[in-house]
């Protein structure tokens, strides 16, 4: 009996050490950026950032903590112009029902200047509802606003994380999990 307890302890301890190692607990990160870094204030829950050819940044943001606490707050896409003096964040989202909770974003700029934005959306209800729980929202970006074009969803989007627009009608999307259940995703994370 005593040997079995020691054996189980070693297995559990080894699993904990492996998980800590995989999570980077024993790594030392050294700064290696010699440029200036500045913080953009006012963005809560920034998930992704992409730049237009003119240097304008588009930032996806969703206050996930407020949703955990029961808030119906909608996520957004901000515009930020880092080269402009005293530039303020501009909330680009059109007035929509709740249900927009962005993750990864991507832009595609056509030669004629028309710009498209795609955003991974993790929704549970609202305007962009789909039976799959996730969708890709496609917008037209026009200087200081977004116009919603359409939603795309399907069974292959199990847990979409990021997106790359190839053109206004095609994109690649990554799933960060293969399982759609919470328990399956937890096993994927810890039993890689």
Stretches found by the model and what they are:
Residues 1-4:
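Positively charged n-region of N-terminal signal peptides that target proteins for export
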Residues 22-44, 85-91, 145-146:
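A short helix->beta-strand "capping" segment at the edge of beta-propeller domains
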Residues 37-63:
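Short extracytoplasmic
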Residues 93-109, 114-170, 178-181, 185-186:
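Asp-box/WD-like beta-propeller blade repeats and closely related beta-sheet repeat scaffolds
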